[in-house]
């Protein structure tokens, strides 16, 4: 960051930003993604993910498929659409009329999930590891079933990895061990290493809907943020680093957590 700060901090995204191109390629190389849009935060990345899902169905002539199905008491950010996506009264109370377009199901209740899918559902959006809702880990088999369900219903799968992605689980993405390929993934906290960066990753199919003018950001993808992201990627994408994250957890943190297992429900 110090090195880049002595050069160029910000320039209009009408110009090519080499640092951003490099970071996008690194993210694509280490993920399912074919296309990346940079933001400044997790909430922005989540809202962009919602836009991408809705725009995709609009682009293929199905504009009424615009509803996003989320988990009750999840957390997707603090902007107005994100709080209503979260399905939590404490998040939405006092913030005016309800933002429409979101439906909710109970974590772990597969019947509830299936019943809530309608002809207007565009995507299922879940946190791979729930944070605000109680550190609930979606099992690999469940992620695989979610992918199959989305394929069957011809809807998109959005895995929100803003909080748990980019090495924080000991894998580059928390969903990696499931071998699932989502359609859209918002990221933020892990890629910035403390600096405000966000991004939404997507596959080629949905990226075709995001033509010039459908989304943008004044500061998203600026040279300073991209330089930070590149440095983080060089460290966190290293397999030795990721293995050490797992080792530290098992050897140092797991023993201190064991007493809690006797008193609290374990969801993973």
Kindly label every feature range from the protein language model.
Residues 1-268:
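Conserved N-terminal phosphate-binding loop of PLP-dependent enzymes in the Aspartate aminotransferase
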């Amino acid at each position: 960051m110090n090195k880049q700060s002595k050069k160029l901090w910000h320039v209009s995204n009408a110009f090519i930003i080499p640092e951003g191109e490099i970071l996008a390629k690194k993210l694509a190389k280490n993920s399912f993604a074919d296309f990346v849009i940079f933001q400044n935060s997790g909430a922005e990345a989540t809202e962009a993910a919602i836009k991408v899902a809705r725009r995709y169905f609009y682009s293929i002539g199905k504009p009424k498929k615009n509803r996003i199905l989320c988990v009750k008491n999840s957390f997707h950010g603090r902007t107005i659409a994100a709080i209503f996506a979260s399905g939590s009264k404490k998040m939405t109370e006092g913030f005016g009329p309800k933002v429409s377009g979101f439906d909710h199901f109970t974590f772990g209740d597969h019947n509830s999930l299936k019943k809530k899918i309608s002809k207007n559902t565009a995507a299922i959006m879940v946190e791979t590891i729930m944070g605000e809702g109680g550190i609930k880990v979606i099992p690999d088999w469940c992620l695989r079933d979610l992918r199959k369900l989305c394929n069957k219903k011809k809807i998109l799968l959005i895995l929100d990895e803003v909080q748990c992605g980019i090495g924080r689980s000991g894998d580059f993405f928390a969903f990696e061990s499931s071998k699932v390929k989502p359609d859209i993934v918002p990221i933020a906290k892990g890629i910035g290493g403390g600096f405000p960066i966000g991004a939404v990753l997507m596959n080629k199919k949905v990226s075709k809907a995001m033509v010039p003018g459908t989304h943008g950001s004044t500061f998203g993808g600026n040279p300073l943020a991209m330089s930070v992201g590149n440095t983080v990627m060089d460290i966190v994408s290293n397999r030795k680093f990721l293995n050490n994250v797992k080792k530290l957890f098992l050897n140092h943190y797991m023993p201190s957590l064991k007493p809690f297992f006797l008193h609290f429900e374990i969801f993973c």
